[in-house]
């Protein structure tokens, strides 16, 4: 865009008059006015070049507001893991893990573990957002995450730590239907949701009961 602008500047009436007069007197040095005008044109082209690069360079970090904007414009994607890639069991908050018998080779993941992993990963695009939030909210910052971000981070973490054929227990998840749906759309199908007796009639439990995926403890 800035390259196309140069010919238009050179064709302006002022520029044509100044340059045409000097072409007939090649032996005369350029006037200060001519040098100044050429310098201004060069500066304008340089500024346009920088603006163009800034607009087109890849986005490596997100602020809180930018994440909300991105999330609001996202369309449904292909999930990270295909159906049957994992044997995935989600364990809601309130279930005593000592009542569960984890297979020796099972991978046990907590959302807090995934979020902290990326808060401490300086080259991750969510590093700035998470640390800004941490500075404002302290240890309770996870409760203030933008809608949907916890699911995004859990998915990224599982992509790094899990592989096809793994048995995975995701603790303290999901807390609500919105996160459950987003997770199944973007990360992986959930094979079983383990809920405490106190939540047997909760919204998440009712949702997964329709597909016979609830186990109450």
Swiss-Prot record:
It is a single-pass membrane protein. Residues 1-26 form a transit peptide. Its main location: mitochondrion. The keyword Cytoplasm does not apply. The chain crosses the membrane at residues 34-50. Keywords: Membrane, Mitochondrion, Transit peptide, Transmembrane, Transmembrane helix. This is Altered inheritance of mitochondria protein 36, mitochondrial.
């Amino acid at each position: 865009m800035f390259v196309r602008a140069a010919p238009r500047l050179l064709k302006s009436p002022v520029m044509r008059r100044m340059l045409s007069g000097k072409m007939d007197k090649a032996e005369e040095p350029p006037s200060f006015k001519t040098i100044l005008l050429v310098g201004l044109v060069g500066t304008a082209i340089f500024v346009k070049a920088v603006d163009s690069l800034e607009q087109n360079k890849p986005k490596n970090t997100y602020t809180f507001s930018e994440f909300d904007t991105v999330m609001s414009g996202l369309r449904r994607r292909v999930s990270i893991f295909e159906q049957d890639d994992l044997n995935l069991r989600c364990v809601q908050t309130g279930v005593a893990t000592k009542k569960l018998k984890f297979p020796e080779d099972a991978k046990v993941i907590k959302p807090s573990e995934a979020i902290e992993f990326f808060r401490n990963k300086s080259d991750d695009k969510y590093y700035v957002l998470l640390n800004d939030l941490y500075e404002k909210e302290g240890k309770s910052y996870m409760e203030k995450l933008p809608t949907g971000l916890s699911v995004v981070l859990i998915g990224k973490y599982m992509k790094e730590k899990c592989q096809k054929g793994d048995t995975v227990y995701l603790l303290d998840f999901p807390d609500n239907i919105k996160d459950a749906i987003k997770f199944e759309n973007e990360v992986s199908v959930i094979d079983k949701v383990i809920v405490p007796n106190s939540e047997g009639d909760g919204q998440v439990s009712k949702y997964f009961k329709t597909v016979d995926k609830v186990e109450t403890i």
